[in-house]
Amino acid sequence: MVRVSTFAAILAMALSVTANVTPNDAGAKNVGTGNGQQFITGGCVNGTDCQSRCCAGNGENKGVCSNEVAANQNGKTGCGFEDPNKAQTVKEAKEQVKKQGF
């Protein structure tokens, strides 16, 4: 019984460490605007999109607004992310806004 519990705990920890943060699509209208209106967990192309001024890479070449304290958690690469595919990211965000209707 103890072995099963230990294995389950280690497995859960391993899965949580490797899980990457996905930008929240609800903030698609704020991606690439550079006006500092994006909320924490919303997508970003750089720090000027974020209220916190911290755009962290999510380890999959996507930006997510983060608090500086949490910028290196859950696979994030820290503040200072600059999206190398900015034009494509902004295009996808605009498509998401049309799809959502807001």
Swiss-Prot record:
Keyword field: Glycoprotein, Secreted, Signal
Triggers of expression: Expression is highly up-regulated in invasive hyphae.
Residues carrying covalently attached carbohydrate according to the record: 46
Primary localization: secreted
Domain of life: Eukaryota
Signal peptide, first to last residue: 1-19
Gene Ontology cellular component terms for the protein in this record: extracellular region
Compartments in which it is found: Secreted
Record function comment: Secreted effector involved in biotrophic colonization of plant cells.
Name of the molecule in the record: Biotrophy-associated secreted protein 2
Species this chain originates from: Pyricularia oryzae (strain 70-15 / ATCC MYA-4617 / FGSC 8958)
Gene behind the chain: BAS2
